[in-house]
């Protein structure tokens, strides 16, 4: 049967953007399949306003240049992938800072996801048992800097 059919008999649930103003999804501009899979996985929900942000590509990074006198990596664990991921998240952060809403009120939350994020059975369960709605309610009452939704 598979998860594909779990939605057949259900109305679209409004996710209310996970309590955020907007969702930014990091994805390579040439990752057409991954973007389509992301869109398909989340298409079963309403209230999911997202925008793809082109990821920094590993092939555009010169790690030796990064490791120059500006960076010290004692463990030698810096890779192009790790650095590209960092730069991609930094790119989204800059995009958030440019949002007019954020410039007026820096307490407005935004969500950053990667294109492999998918609804999990735990999310579905929390929606149907009311826990998700409770989390959104609590988030709206408090001032917070980071809330980690997944693993």
Regions from the language model: what does each represent?
Residues 1-113, 117-151:
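An acidic/histidine-cluster motif and surrounding catalytic segment
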């Amino acid at each position: 049967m598979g998860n594909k059919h779990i939605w057949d008999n259900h109305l679209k649930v409004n996710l209310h953007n996970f309590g955020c103003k907007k969702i930014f999804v990091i994805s390579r501009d040439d990752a057409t399949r991954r973007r389509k899979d992301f869109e398909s996985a989340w298409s079963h929900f309403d209230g999911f306003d997202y925008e793809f942000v082109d990821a920094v590509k590993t092939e555009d990074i010169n790690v030796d240049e990064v490791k120059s006198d500006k960076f010290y990596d004692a463990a030698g664990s810096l890779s192009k992938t790790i650095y590209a991921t960092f730069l991609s998240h930094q790119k989204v952060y800059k995009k958030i800072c440019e949002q007019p809403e954020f410039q007026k009120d820096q307490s407005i939350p935004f969500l950053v996801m990667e294109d492999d994020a998918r609804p999990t059975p735990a999310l579905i369960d929390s929606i149907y048992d009311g826990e998700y709605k409770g989390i959104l309610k609590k988030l709206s009452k408090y001032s917070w800097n980071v809330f980690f939704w997944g693993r």
